[in-house]
Amino acid sequence: MVKAKIAVNGYGTIGKRVADAVRAQDDMEVIGISKTKPNYEAAVAHQIGYDIYAPAANLEAFEKAGMPAAGTIEEMVEKADLVVDCTPGGIGEKNKPMYEKAGVKAIWQGGEDHSLAGFSFNAICNYEQAVGRDLVRVVSCNTTALCRAIYPIDKELGVKKARVVLARRATDPNDVKKGPINAIVPDPIKLPSHHGPDVKSVLPQINITSAALKIPTTLMHVHTVNMEVEKDCTVDDVKNIFGSQPRIRFVGQGMSSTAEIMEFARDMKRPRNDMWENCIWPESITVGDKELYFFQAVHQESIVVPENVDAIRAMMEFESDGAKSIEKTNKAIGLSKK
């Protein structure tokens, strides 16, 4: 089997997870990852066998640190069929000319604007439209979770309007530079938050509004979701719809917080405690007068990872059926709802 040669530009929270997920597939391989500095993440990448590429000005620093770089980032890009850009928001836009010059396909993350790629991706919603594309943006963690939940409800019941309040984790567990530590921050104060409009970049037919708060935690986001639907339904109808989705998990069995969900991921021996699925509390699902409500938790560090793998497979035209790609990706990384 010919494998797609994938470069991961940016080996941070998302990049290192994407690299490992790509490595787990049988139809793609990681030809290199990029780091700007020879820090602990670069050291681990070197230890587990990734070829590291760095800015030309920093090659000597990597050499002195005992992890010689395989070349420059530009050289890595030249060797790739497709680059997954996992650099911080705003940096990816600056990298676009480099990808265009090399003639490679590129994926960006949700921190970049929709206009950068002209197409925003979610595997369950619009996989088939990504087949053969050269440029794709995988939407953010929150938008990914909302698309996964809204799309099947719209398909089965018709969504007249969605309203979402997001309690967002302040920062990732390894980030000591951000906060808040002892505050709740409306983010933004002016409504709506960007999440509703971002959902519309994938599902333009959905009438949605959103508001968000930053809270002093690092584990997960939590969404309070309300949808007005076209058809009468019951709680069991909604549970059956969500239960049929390959990347939605019900969290019951005494899990009443994000802390317990993360402990559950540890107990399942998930890599890095990752929870790639939407985590919906089934007892929160409430239905009445053609409206439904529920809570869901979102692991911001990992939920977009399988989406990136599916985007690669679509863009490389290895699989035209989104459901088959999702199944293949899930199996390879160990995403099982059992």
UniProtKB/Swiss-Prot annotation:
The active site is at 141 (nucleophile). It comes from Methanosarcina barkeri (strain Fusaro / DSM 804). Transmembrane segments: none annotated. It is an enzyme of class 1 (oxidoreductase). The lineage of its organism: Archaea, Methanobacteriati, Methanobacteriota, Stenosarchaea group, Methanomicrobia. D-glyceraldehyde 3-phosphate binds at residues 140-142, 195-196. GO terms for cellular component: cytoplasm. This is Glyceraldehyde-3-phosphate dehydrogenase 1. NAD(+) binds at residues 13-14, 111, 169, 300. It comes from the Archaea. Homotetramer. One of its GO terms (biological process) is lysine biosynthetic process via diaminopimelate. Keywords: Cytoplasm, Glycolysis, NAD, NADP, Oxidoreductase. It is found in: Cytoplasm. HAMAP family: G3P_dehdrog_arch (MF_00559). Pathway: Carbohydrate degradation; glycolysis; pyruvate from D-glyceraldehyde 3-phosphate: step 1/5. Belongs to the glyceraldehyde-3-phosphate dehydrogenase family.
